[in-house]
UniProtKB/Swiss-Prot annotation:
It is found in: Nucleus. Residues 45-56 have a biased composition (Polar residues). GO terms for cellular component: nucleus; ubiquitin ligase complex. This is DCN1-like protein 4. Changing D250A: Does not affect localization at nucleus. Residues 101-287 form the DCUN1 domain. Gene3D superfamilies: Cullin, PONY binding domain, EF-hand. PROSITE patterns: DCUN1.
C-alpha cells in the first residue's frame, strides 16, 4: 500500500511539473505575441514611444554637421568678392556723378576760356572751337550762339554760358562734342531754321547800327543759304556788283522767303508783289544776264 501511494505521488508531481512548464511556455508565447503586435502598431502609426528622446530626435532631424572653420583661402575669396562688389558700386556711382550736370563744373569749364572780365573773347573763342573740333565759321557755332542767346558775335558772357549750357546739359568739352549733331538738327527744321536765320541778323550786326554791313551780310547768307539755295552763288554775285552797302532787316528776312518760294527760273516771281526793291533789282539783273 505504501509503495502504491508513493507511485501515485510521483505521477502527480510529474503532471504538476509538466503543467507548470506548459504554463511558463504559454506566458512566454503571450509576451512574444504582445511585443510583436506592439511593434507592428508602432511601425504603422509612426509612434516613437519605443525610442529614447535622443534617438527620436535623430530620426526626425538629421544630425547637424559641424561647421568647418574658415580657411585662409575662404576668407580671401570672400574679401575678394566684397571688394569686387564695392568697386562695381563705386564705379557706377562715379559714372553717374560724371553724367549728371554740374553747375560748378560748368563754371570751371567757362573759366578755361574766359578772361578776367568774365567774358569768352576772340582768343578764348578760338581755343574753345579748337577743343570741340569745330571751325569758328562753321554754322553749328551760330546754332550754339542761338542756344546760348549770345548777343555779340565772337563773345560769350558768363550769364549766357551758364544759361545756355544748362539748357543743353553740357558741363564739359566732351559733352558738347557729343551734342553737336543735336545742334545741327535744328537746321533741318524749317521753323527753327527761320528762328536761327532771323537771330543771325541781330547777332552779326554792330549794336549801334540798325542794318548789317554788306560784307558781313554776304558771309552770313553764305553760311546759312550757301548749301541749300541753288541761286545763292548768283545772288552773291549780284550783291558783289550792286551799289548796296548795307542790308536792313526787312531785306534780310525777305531773302529767306524768296529762296523758299520762288522757282529757280523765277517764273513765279510777281514784280507787283510786296518784295523789297533789292529783290526786284536782282530778278531784273538775273533775267538780263540770262538773255545776254
Amino acid at each position: 500500500m505504501h509503495s502504491d501511494a508513493a507511485a501515485v505521488n510521483f505521477q502527480l508531481n510529474s503532471h504538476l511539473s509538466t503543467l507548470a512548464n506548459i504554463h511558463k511556455i504559454y506566458h512566454t508565447l503571450n509576451k512574444l505575441n504582445l511585443t510583436e503586435d506592439i511593434g507592428q502598431d508602432d511601425h504603422q502609426t509612426g509612434s516613437l514611444r519605443s525610442c529614447s528622446s535622443s534617438d527620436c530626435f535623430n530620426k526626425v532631424m538629421p544630425p547637424r554637421k559641424k561647421r568647418r572653420p574658415a580657411s585662409g583661402d575662404d576668407l580671401s575669396a570672400k574679401k575678394s568678392r566684397h571688394d569686387s562688389m564695392y568697386r562695381k558700386y563705386d564705379s557706377t556711382r562715379i559714372k553717374t556723378e560724371e553724367e549728371a550736370f554740374s553747375s560748378k563744373r560748368c563754371l570751371e569749364w567757362f573759366y578755361e576760356y574766359a578772361g578776367t572780365d568774365d567774358v569768352v573773347g576772340p582768343e578764348g573763342m578760338e581755343k574753345f572751337c579748337e577743343d570741340i573740333g569745330v571751325e569758328p565759321e562753321n554754322v553749328v557755332m551760330l546754332v550754339l550762339a542761338w542756344k546760348l542767346d549770345a548777343q555779340n558775335m565772337g563773345y560769350f558772357t558768363l550769364q549766357e554760358w551758364l544759361k545756355g549750357m544748362t539748357s543743353l546739359q553740357c558741363d564739359t568739352t566732351e559733352k558738347l562734342r557729343n551734342t553737336l549733331d543735336y545742334l545741327r538738327s535744328f537746321l533741318n527744321d524749317s521753323t527753327n531754321f527761320k528762328l536761327i536765320y532771323r537771330y543771325a541778323f541781330d547777332f552779326a550786326r554792330e549794336k549801334d547800327q540798325r542794318s548789317l554791313d554788306i560784307n558781313t551780310a554776304k558771309c552770313m547768307l553764305g553760311l546759312l543759304l550757301g548749301k541749300i539755295w541753288p541761286l545763292f552763288p548768283v545772288f552773291h554775285q549780284f550783291l558783289e556788283q550792286s551799289k548796296y552797302k548795307v542790308i536792313n532787316k526787312d531785306q534780310w528776312c525777305n531773302v529767306l522767303e524768296f529762296s523758299r518760294t520762288i522757282n529757280l527760273d523765277l517764273s513765279n516771281y510777281d514784280e507787283d508783289g510786296a518784295w523789297p526793291v533789292l529783290l526786284d533789282e536782282f530778278v531784273e539783273w538775273y533775267k538780263d544776264k540770262q538773255m545776254s
